[in-house]
Amino acid sequence: MWRQAKWNEPLIFELNKSGAARQGFLINKDEEIRSQIKEMKIPKNLLRENEPDLPSLSELEVVRHFVRLSQMNFGVDIGIMPLGSCTMKYNPKIEEKATAITEFHHPLEDEDYIQGILEMIYELQNWFSEITGMDECSLQVPAGSAGEFAGVLMIKKYHEEHNRNYKDTILVADTAHGTNPASAAMAGYKVMYVKSNAEGLVDMDILREIVNDKTAGFMLTNPNTLGLFEENILEISKIIHSTNAVLYYDGANLNGVLGIARPGDMGFDIVHLNLHKTFAVPHGGGGPGAGAICAKGELVNYLPYPMVEKVNGKYKLSKIPKNSIGKIATFYGNVGNLARSFAYILGLGPQGIQMIGKMSTLATNYLIAKLRDVKELELIAPNRHRKHEVVFSVKQLMENYGVSANDVAKALLDNGFYAPTIYFPPIVEEALMIEPTETETKETLDMFAETLKKIVNDAKINPEQVMKSPNNTSIARLDQAYANHPSTITPTYRVLRLRRLGKIDYLK
């Protein structure tokens, strides 16, 4: 039986309760250096009034603290993480070496001394353009979501340049990721949802009905969030372009068609990529991520700058598209993560890239085949082929036994599996969204499927047991309201300290 470690581990600031002065290393007070720099004259306005509130700990204490925390955590190095629409694939460790060459990463480094880094970015621009079927690509954006926002800003400026300010609405699918309507709203657009039909695809009749002169663009994933390929994509492209609107590709689900189908060939005009999903940038912990925004035709003129170009054999960070929306962030993206993606693509090559799309699709459909006889795991359009992910509904378990999707997810935790995404997309009741990715073995998928079958059976025989899960994890069920309420949410040690001192009530 799987059991997670459970340590009564305090915060690192609370480890040294004795107040003893401890150090992980000693600073060498070199007299020769001191004699050369003399007295350091730091302006008073830059000096701290008090010493920094840092924990005084030995190296051993720090190592043990974080190792114990890691034992109470879960990651892809421990087991499968089937979080749907997150593509929690295993990232080869060799990519870490690529990003470890930190001396060439400083954003103010002279171009003459970072030709290798600029060449890498230049090649990535071309590779991502080829992979997506776009004409050009900018890597200036610091994350996938920032790339998405940049794409909507490009749509907005494109219409403004063509005196089409009356286009005030962005369409999004009802299975869309939440960042789609958020990006559109942040750019000042109204948002209108396009409903899915009974087969889980864009309802073409509804689309034809709502597209009009005010439509600025349509944000769509393909495959969609149900794991289904939008088979009418070429017709969708014609409908959107008939009103001079822009077809925007959310790259969140690219893994399922990588190397097999390209957004540009489907009729999309702008593509954003999540390098943390598809191209070996690690997930979790709040970042940093990395993004790419690609475009074709006239829309390349609106890409964020700067872009790398090759001039007389020298790589320069000097390309500024004619109608660029400008910079999305300071300096140039997250270069360390771009190095990870560069090493990943270079190691795989075109054939390896294509195998990602094939194997991720195979893994999903194999899992469906293993679970097809479990009638409590319902599918929209059950006979349709899936791509990168699948969404099951456990509505029957909820209606007949009171066991929810959340309960099933917690029971998976009890068996040493990370939980799938739940209650998304919202068009599926009691949804379990599972994305196995291409890196999981048949044996792992078999174990996952058998465990899910067992949980469904347990839910029918002893539902109370499932509803009490998890029992084998470091922490059981959190009080979500308490954890997120402004009067109790405590994201940092400083907030905790202020709460204890009674100096803060609501976190704004």
From Swiss-Prot:
It catalyses: N(6)-[(R)-lipoyl]-L-lysyl-[glycine-cleavage complex H protein] + glycine + H(+) = N(6)-[(R)-S(8)-aminomethyldihydrolipoyl]-L-lysyl-[glycine-cleavage complex H protein] + CO2. GO terms for biological process: glycine decarboxylation via glycine cleavage system. The keyword Hydrolase does not apply. This is Probable glycine dehydrogenase (decarboxylating) subunit 2. The keyword Oxidoreductase applies. One of its GO terms (molecular function) is pyridoxal phosphate binding. It comes from Saccharolobus solfataricus (strain ATCC 35092 / DSM 1617 / JCM 11322 / P2). InterPro entries: GcvPB, GDC-P_C, GDC-P_N, GDC_P, PyrdxlP-dep_Trfase, PyrdxlP-dep_Trfase_major, PyrdxlP-dep_Trfase_small. Its EC number is 1.4.4.2. Keywords: Oxidoreductase, Pyridoxal phosphate. It holds the Pfam family GDC-P. The glycine cleavage system catalyzes the degradation of glycine. The P protein binds the alpha-amino group of glycine through its pyridoxal phosphate cofactor; CO(2) is released and the remaining methylamine moiety is then transferred to the lipoamide cofactor of the H protein. NCBIfam families: PRK04366.1. One of its GO terms (cellular component) is glycine cleavage complex. Its cofactor is pyridoxal 5'-phosphate. The glycine cleavage system is composed of four proteins: P, T, L and H. In this organism, the P 'protein' is a heterodimer of two subunits. The gene is gcvPB. Belongs to the GcvP family. C-terminal subunit subfamily.
